[in-house]
Amino acid sequence: MSEGASQGGAYRAGIQVTLKPGVFDPQGAAVAGALGTLGFAGVADVRVGRYVELRLTAPDEATARATVERMCETLLANLVIERYAFNLTQEAG
């Protein structure tokens, strides 16, 4: 999940939030139907999620990672029906 050194500074997090398996995805169903209507055959089980990218400063990578975890669990994902994953990279300079 991570790249870069453990020094402090600026970090960029790319966060992907998706519905948990088994949770009905009405947007995904609509997209699958539209793709079929447009002639794209063989498309099934479309899932629609969201992507959040943010920049943060932290004294070290572990603190940055813990902060992003708290952001996801507090605001960015509804943990009852969604799951999340993120990549964290330290910005150069």
How would you name each of these model-derived features?
Residues 1-93:
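Long, contiguous binding/interaction regions
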